[in-house]
């Protein structure tokens, strides 16, 4: 039986969803129906939310799990009347933090994600634009401005990893797909050689690569197991020969891959 989980916020819901998802991921034997409800910022919206929570409780026969980052005390009290198990993220952590810092919280909605008061905003946008402009080897003449250059076979996870690092940490990451021609030459493309210190390799299990490519080009040579196995074998050999640090992306999330890359390469996050 699935449990229902709500991520409720009077702002975008990013914080409630991120922390809630991380906590629920620790219970991989339990399936969840997950719902994000942003901008619950008036008593009327809160009462409507209570109706949704109670309906889910009646349907499931179990209390929904509620993760909330509601700042307004009145709205929190309305939500607390629901038949749900509430995890109030702000009140759980802010009160002891206020005591430790001997200061009062501003209790501002959406504080961490605001544009005007956040000097990291433009860094984030510039990093995302860099990742998009330098995706899939489309441009190589800006590699001198890159913090990292991810290399690997097509569809091994380079693009989502670059975008995640850009969004979360302001890292300017380019990516370059190693092709069959590169493998036949048994050496790095010239454009990558001069940026060797920025290179990090992604590899992947051949059967997983086959499944991913099959969704894009089914029943093609590109997605065949034999082709995928060949490319992975040759690229891993190239990584060893050129002494390029690398990670197998098969069993890791994009968050884990990104963290491992930054640690391995010693790249500092532009913001945290």
From Swiss-Prot:
Annotated catalysed reactions: [pyruvate, water dikinase] + ADP = [pyruvate, water dikinase]-phosphate + AMP + H(+); [pyruvate, water dikinase]-phosphate + phosphate + H(+) = [pyruvate, water dikinase] + diphosphate
Single GO term (MF): protein serine/threonine kinase activity
Keywords: Kinase, Nucleotide-binding, Serine/threonine-protein kinase, Transferase
Residues that coordinate or bind ADP: 152-159
Classification via Pfam families: Kinase-PPPase
EC number(s) reported in the record: 2.7.11.33, 2.7.4.28
Reported function: Bifunctional serine/threonine kinase and phosphorylase involved in the regulation of the phosphoenolpyruvate synthase (PEPS) by catalyzing its phosphorylation/dephosphorylation.
Similarity comment: Belongs to the pyruvate, phosphate/water dikinase regulatory protein family. PSRP subfamily.
HAMAP family, alphabetized: PSRP
Protein name: Putative phosphoenolpyruvate synthase regulatory protein
């Amino acid at each position: 039986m699935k449990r229902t989980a709500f991520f409720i916020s009077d702002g975008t819901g990013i914080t409630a969803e991120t922390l809630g998802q991380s906590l629920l991921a620790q219970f991989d034997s339990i399936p969840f129906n997950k719902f994000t409800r942003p901008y619950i910022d008036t008593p009327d919206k809160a009462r409507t939310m209570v109706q949704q929570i109670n309906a889910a409780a009646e349907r499931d026969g179990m209390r929904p799990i509620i993760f909330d980052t509601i700042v307004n005390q009145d709205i929190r009290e309305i939500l607390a009347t629901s038949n749900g198990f509430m995890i109030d993220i702000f009140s759980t952590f802010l009160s002891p933090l206020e005591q430790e810092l001997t200061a009062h919280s501003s209790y501002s909605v959406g504080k961490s994600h605001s544009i005007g008061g956040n000097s990291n905003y433009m860094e984030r946008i510039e990093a995302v634009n860099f990742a998009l402009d330098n995706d899939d080897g489309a441009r190589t003449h800006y590699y001198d401005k890159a913090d990292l250059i991810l290399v690997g076979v097509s569809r091994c996870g380079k693009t989502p990893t670059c975008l995640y690092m850009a969004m979360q940490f302001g890292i300017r990451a380019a990516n370059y797909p190693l092709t069959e021609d590169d493998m036949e030459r048994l050496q790095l493309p010239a454009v990558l050689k001069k940026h060797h210190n920025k290179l990090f390799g992604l590899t992947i299990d051949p059967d997983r690569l086959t499944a991913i490519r099959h969704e894009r080009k089914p029943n093609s040579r590109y997605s065949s197991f034999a082709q995928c196995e060949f490319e992975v074998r040759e690229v891993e050999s190239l990584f060893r020969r050129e002494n390029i640090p690398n990670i197998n992306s098969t069993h890791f999330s994009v968050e884990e891959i990104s963290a491992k890359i930054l640690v391995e390469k010693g790249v500092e996050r532009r913001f945290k």
